[in-house]
């Protein structure tokens, strides 16, 4: 069955999630999107493709990833003895985050298309690292675009990318949105190098078929977690919680629970947006809460707009969530009510970062810390037994130096008694950004 990608275009697969999605791109890109969609459809029908993908998941990425129950967190209120928090350990995937799930899938498609060069945008550097990783694995050239502010706060990942042979280009953030600006520049590169280049978009946004194939490759997260929770607890989780920027890790964590399977309808799906300095300020990255619909980076979805209807700056302590838009399926899930979307502030995320590090010996990515922050809040408010599954989308090694500057003397104090309530993220970023390596 074909479906319109715009009011007049036809695609092999459904290009929309309700009213969200589509292919709102320059006409020159449409043949490349069609080519990618055909390759994806053909790959799904080719058993050798799935065999190669599964082999790489197992023997290169190290899947399946385990589930760890938090055993020592000093839960507050009713949560003590009532709530159980489980972590889906995507931080243990080779590369340090969930991103490798789909970079391997897209790189295999690029190989089928005869492409020799991969380009990508990155915020926290995790997607850039995963792209550089698969480019090295498959012997392909690689260029990664990254906002100058993000280059400054994610130096370990910048070095990792270059170590694996990638060219890292610091992007002038004219719009104030590092990740958004990096996507703009990457799309421009793709337009000018379609013959040999595949744009390995890093999130579940962008023009069709990117949201669909990114979800497919990341759905391995929830396929595993559903089976693991049944085996571990004898039941599905009461709630699955994941952070949401563009939304790739969350859509992967939700995917299997969206299928028509017994018990799925009872599982709450909760996406946590970066509330930054607060949802009542303009210093956040929460388009589902604060945004309106617009065409951004090739698809129709929610985005942060100013009073004049122009894209406005986003803000988050975590570079990977500092994006003014969100993937179209998340917009649809919000509208239908199948998923809930909440916010966690910079301070709440940093507090969760400290708690998991101090009490469980697991240093989470700042992105994942937003999801953990909401899980801790749910646990504190629980009045009856509840099993909460948090998608720990990445590890926090990349954030340690940055967090050290943010926390100062708080780093050595017990977070259970020294509760962080505010933090001067913008002040630290202003000090960091001039040091960005723009080579």
Curated annotation (Swiss-Prot):
E.C. number: 4.2.1.20
Pathway the protein contributes to: Amino-acid biosynthesis; L-tryptophan biosynthesis; L-tryptophan from chorismate: step 5/5
Domain of life, source organism: Bacteria
Gene Ontology MF, one: tryptophan synthase activity
CDD domains in the cross-refs: Trp-synth_B
Modified residues (N6-(pyridoxal phosphate)lysine): 99
Entry cofactors: pyridoxal 5'-phosphate
Catalytic activity reported: (1S,2R)-1-C-(indol-3-yl)glycerol 3-phosphate + L-serine = D-glyceraldehyde 3-phosphate + L-tryptophan + H2O
Quaternary structure and partners: Tetramer of two alpha and two beta chains.
Record-given protein name: Tryptophan synthase beta chain 2
């Amino acid at each position: 069955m074909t479906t319109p990608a715009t009011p007049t275009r036809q695609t092999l697969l459904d290009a929309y999630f309700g009213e969200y999605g589509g292919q709102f791109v320059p006409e020159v890109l449409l043949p490349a999107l069609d080519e990618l969609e055909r390759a994806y459809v053909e790959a799904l029908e080719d058993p050798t493709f799935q065999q190669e993908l599964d082999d790489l998941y197992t023997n290169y990425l190290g899947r399946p990833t385990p589930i760890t129950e938090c055993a020592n967190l000093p839960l507050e209120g009713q949560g003590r003895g009532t709530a159980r928090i489980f972590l889906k350990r995507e931080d243990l995937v080779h590369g340090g985050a969930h991103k490798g799930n789909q970079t391997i899938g897209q790189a295999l498609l690029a190989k089928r298309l005869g492409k020799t060069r991969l380009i990508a945008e990155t915020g926290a550097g995790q997607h850039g690292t995963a792209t550089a990783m698969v480019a090295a694995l498959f012997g392909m050239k690689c260029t990664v675009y990254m906002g100058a502010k993000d280059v400054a706060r994610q130096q370990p990942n910048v070095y990792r990318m270059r170590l694996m042979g990638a060219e890292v280009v610091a992007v002038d953030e004219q719009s104030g949105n590092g990740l958004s600006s990096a996507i703009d520049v990457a799309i421009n590169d793709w337009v000018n190098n379609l013959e040999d280049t595949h744009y390995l978009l890093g999130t579940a946004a962008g023009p069709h078929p990117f949201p669909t194939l990114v979800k497919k490759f990341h759905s391995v997260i929830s396929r595993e977690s559903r089976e693991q929770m049944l085996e571990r607890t004898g039941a599905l989780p009461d709630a699955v919680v994941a952070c949401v920027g563009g939304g790739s890790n969350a859509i992967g964590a939700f995917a299997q629970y969206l299928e028509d399977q017994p018990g799925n309808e009872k599982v709450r799906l909760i996406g946590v947006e970066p509330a930054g300095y607060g949802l009542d300020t303009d210093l956040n990255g929460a388009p589902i809460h604060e945004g309106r619909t617009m065409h951004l980076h090739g698809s129709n979805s929610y985005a942060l707009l100013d009073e004049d209807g122009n894209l406005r700056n986003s803000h988050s302590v975590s570079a990977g969530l500092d994006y003014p838009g969100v993937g179209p399926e998340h917009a649809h899930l919000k509208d239908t009510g199948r998923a809930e979307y909440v916010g966690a502030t910079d301070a709440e995320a940093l507090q969760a970062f400290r708690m998991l590090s101090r009490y469980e010996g697991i240093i989470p990515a700042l992105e994942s810390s937003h999801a953990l922050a909401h899980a801790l809040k749910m646990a504190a408010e629980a009045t009856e037994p509840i099993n909460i599954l948090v998608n720990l989308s990445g590890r926090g090694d990349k954030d340690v130096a940055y967090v050290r500057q943010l926390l100062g003397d708080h780093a050595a104090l017990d977070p259970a008694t020294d509760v962080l309530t505010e933090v001067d993220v913008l002040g630290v970023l202003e000090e960091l950004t001039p040091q960005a390596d723009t080579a």
